[in-house]
UniProtKB/Swiss-Prot annotation:
The gene is ABHD5. It comes from Pongo abelii. It is found in: Cytoplasm; Lipid droplet. It catalyses: a 1-acyl-sn-glycero-3-phosphate + an acyl-CoA = a 1,2-diacyl-sn-glycero-3-phosphate + CoA; 1-(9Z-octadecenoyl)-sn-glycero-3-phosphate + (9Z)-octadecenoyl-CoA = 1,2-di-(9Z-octadecenoyl)-sn-glycero-3-phosphate + CoA; 1-(9Z-octadecenoyl)-sn-glycero-3-phosphate + hexadecanoyl-CoA = 1-(9Z)-octadecenoyl-2-hexadecanoyl-sn-glycero-3-phosphate + CoA; 1-(9Z-octadecenoyl)-sn-glycero-3-phosphate + octadecanoyl-CoA = 1-(9Z-octadecenoyl)-2-octadecanoyl-sn-glycero-3-phosphate + CoA. Coenzyme A-dependent lysophosphatidic acid acyltransferase that catalyzes the transfer of an acyl group on a lysophosphatidic acid. Functions preferentially with 1-oleoyl-lysophosphatidic acid followed by 1-palmitoyl-lysophosphatidic acid, 1-stearoyl-lysophosphatidic acid and 1-arachidonoyl-lysophosphatidic acid as lipid acceptor. Functions preferentially with arachidonoyl-CoA followed by oleoyl-CoA as acyl group donors. Functions in phosphatidic acid biosynthesis. May regulate the cellular storage of triacylglycerol through activation of the phospholipase PNPLA2. This is 1-acylglycerol-3-phosphate O-acyltransferase ABHD5. Acyltransferase activity is inhibited by detergents such as Triton X-100 and 3-[(3-cholamidopropyl)dimethylammonio]-1-propanesulfonate (CHAPS). Acyltransferase activity is inhibited by the presence of magnesium and calcium. Pfam families: Abhydrolase_1 (PF00561). Its main location: cytoplasm. One of its GO terms (molecular function) is lipase activator activity. The modification Phosphoserine is found at residue 122. Its EC number is 2.3.1.51.
């Protein structure tokens, strides 16, 4: 369904990402226009009207935003934060259900999707703060008082970080398969030690961004996504019969690697967080309810909910398992996921 209004074409400036110089512009078949078209294809089957706009924040940056049912004023808005390597388009299976009786906002995280892609700090704590402040500035710009904040993967980590710093703005925190909560286990404590060849490969790849391979692959990058992640096409098969989803993921991740570099600066080898959230979440305001949603078939450690409960023994913490779902819970079992999220939201108002 067409959007109600689009104020400008994109939060980006320039037809091509600035870092793609020399031979790379012809090597990587992408541009901000390609990403815009890919996003529009992702959203064309969303069964409700919405408004899309770039929200201006500090330093000339913009946060690309979708608003659903924003004219409903008596319900706390639900705000969706996507995960690493994603964008707001990946919520396409969820918008219709979630916005039936409350405002829903989704935006591309700073450095991802169609939001601005600035240079981030190299320090993990400062990177985290840059993300958190961009969310707070976005909230202020839209005039939202309080939010139900939902984050998947990296978005879950940032939603928790935001809730720690701005507790008065969060009525409920929903963590969906959150990244970055446990500490990296000591190799000596692991039942299955990491093979030497994997450690060697990890050391060799340390100077590079996580998705650099897609850009190095150039015109073969899209087929690489299709080969490595054929499951994404299946997840969205009820909405698209073609390669719409993989094209969107490809164009999201071959632009300037701004958020990707920021994520790398927040990690230590093998994807663990430099500043694990479980070390801090016990300091979260006790009145903030937390719901943790995970896929019963996910390969990610699903014990974060139990750990959070032990660290917040006098606060509301609930863990919800979605049967038949993996890490991408919202796409694997969208109807069940949407229902659980709506039930959580109904406890707020």
């Amino acid at each position: 369904m067409a959007a109600e209004e689009e104020e400008v074409d994109s939060a980006d400036t320039g037809e091509r990402s600035g870092w793609l110089t020399g031979w790379l512009p012809t090597w990587c078949p992408t541009s901000t226009s390609h990403l815009k078209e890919a996003e529009e294809k992702m959203l064309k089957c969303v069964p409700c009207t919405y408004k899309k706009e770039p929200v201006h924040i500090s330093n000339g940056n913009k946060i690309w935003t979708l608003k659903f049912s924003h004219n409903i004023s008596n319900k706390t808005p639900l705000v969706l934060l996507h995960g690493f390597g994603g964008g707001l388009g990946l919520w396409a299976l969820n918008f219709g259900d979630l916005c039936t009786n409350r405002p829903v906002y989704a935006f591309d995280l700073l450095g991802f999707g169609r939001s601005s892609r600035p240079r981030f700090d190299s320090d993990a704590e400062e990177v985290e703060n840059q993300f958190v402040e961009s969310i707070e500035e976005w909230r202020c710009a839209l005039g939202l008082d309080k939010m139900i904040l939902l984050g998947h993967n990296l978005g879950g980590f940032l939603a928790a970080a935001y809730s720690l710093k701005y507790p008065s703005r969060v009525n409920h925190l929903i963590l969906v398969e959150p990244w970055g909560f446990p500490e990296r286990p000591d190799l000596a404590d692991q039942d299955r030690p990491i093979p030497v060849w994997i450690r060697a490969l990890g050391a060799a790849l340390t100077p590079f961004n996580p998705l650099a391979g897609l850009r190095i692959a150039g015109p073969f990058g899209l087929s690489l996504v299709q080969r490595l992640r054929p499951d994404f096409k299946r997840k969205y098969s009820s909405m698209f019969e073609d390669d719409t989803v993989t094209e969107y993921i490809y164009h999201c991740n071959v632009q300037t690697p701004s958020g990707e570099t920021a994520f790398k600066n927040m990690t230590i080898p093998y994807g663990w967080a430099k500043r694990p959230m479980l070390q801090r979440i016990g300091k979260m305001h006790p009145d903030i309810p937390v719901s943790v949603i995970f896929g019963a078939r996910s390969c990610i450690d699903g014990n974060s909910g139990t750990s959070i409960q032990s660290l917040r023994p006098h606060s509301y913490v609930k863990t919800i398992a979605i049967l038949g779902a993996g890490h991408y819970v919202y796409a694997d079992q969208p109807e069940e996921f949407n229902q659980k999220v709506k039930e959580i939201c109904d406890t707020v108002d």
